[in-house]
């Protein structure tokens, strides 16, 4: 994963995964749990979502709502690592994520951009696994 690539130790880091889909949200919560990170699985209608995001060490955004998480969801005194998995269009039809990048980049310890963040990593991972899978299917 991207977090592993940058040698981010997940053990003991509080994580909030926003989005409960079977494609991203739930698998990501399992992955983080398997690396000893306590995880809160939330969604866009979680009551007082800011209470969770403002105290988290890691925030994974996968809710499918353009620029949903703005600066008010984060605490500059406790900067999180923010992974934006969202792929949306804003009001001008420009690609954007679930996180309002321009507002949050000055608050977050690290943040993935959209486009250019998680998307290329996904393509790389698919390509990395495609050849071995094809080789196995030919045997």
Indicate residue ranges for each PLM-predicted region.
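Rossmann-fold NAD(P)-binding glycine/threonine-rich loop
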Residues: 77, 81-139
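Glycine-rich phosphate/diphosphate-binding loop of Rossmann-like nucleotide-binding domains
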Residues: 1-81, 93-102
């Amino acid at each position: 994963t991207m977090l592993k690539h940058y040698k981010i130790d997940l053990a003991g880091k509080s994580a909030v995964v926003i989005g409960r889909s079977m494609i991203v949200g739930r698998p990501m919560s399992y992955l983080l749990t398997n690396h000893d990170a306590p995880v809160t699985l939330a969604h866009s209608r979680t009551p007082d979502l800011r209470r969770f995001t403002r105290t988290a060490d890691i925030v994974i955004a996968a809710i499918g709502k353009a620029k949903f998480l703005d600066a008010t969801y984060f605490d500059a005194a406790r900067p999180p690592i923010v992974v934006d998995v969202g792929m949306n269009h804003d009001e001008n039809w420009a690609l954007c994520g679930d996180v309002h990048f321009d507002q949050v980049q000055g608050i977050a310890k690290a943040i993935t951009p959209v486009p250019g963040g998680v998307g290329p990593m996904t393509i790389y991972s698919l390509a990395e696994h495609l050849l071995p899978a094809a080789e196995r299917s030919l045997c």
